[in-house]
């Protein structure tokens, strides 16, 4: 069963320094995004925007891969003092 998930992270509360934001993004990419079978998209805020954000559209081959990625996202969020990661599981409809 394939699962589509949109994942979004940000630093709108300005808790992370630029170096910490970099490390947060690298950790998310390494320990969440890489579990996806397909990366349908990867988006970032404007480099000169007041706040930093990143989003991914991910397709997982299995529910188990998605669960591991979600647990990793929760752990990373906690390590980097972030209140949340947006995790939206999409019911995909082909029309």
Language-model features and meaning:
Residues 1-24, 30:
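Short S/T/G/P-rich N-terminal loop/turn motif that feeds into the first structured element of a domain
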Residues 1-5, 35, 52-56, 81-84:
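Generic structural motif recognizing short loop/turn segments at the entrances and edges of beta-strands
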Residues 8, 12, 17, 56, ...:
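Extended, folded cores of ATP/NTP-driven motor/assembly subunits in large transport
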Residues 10-15, 33-34, 46, 77:
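Alpha-helical interaction segments
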Residues 22-28, 67-80:
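Short amphipathic alpha-helices in soluble, non-transmembrane regions
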Residues 37, 78-95:
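Conserved short beta-strand edge segments in small beta-sheet-based binding/regulatory domains
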């Amino acid at each position: 069963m394939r699962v589509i998930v949109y994942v979004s992270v940000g630093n709108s509360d300005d808790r992370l320094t630029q170096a910490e934001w970099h490390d947060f993004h690298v950790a998310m990419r390494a320990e969440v995004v890489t579990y996806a079978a397909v990366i349908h998209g990867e988006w970032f805020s404007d480099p000169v925007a007041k706040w930093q954000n990143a989003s991914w559209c991910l397709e997982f081959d299995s529910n188990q891969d998605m669960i591991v990625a979600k647990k990793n996202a929760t752990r990373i969020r906690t390590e980097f003092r972030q209140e949340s990661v947006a995790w939206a599981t999409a019911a995909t409809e082909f029309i």
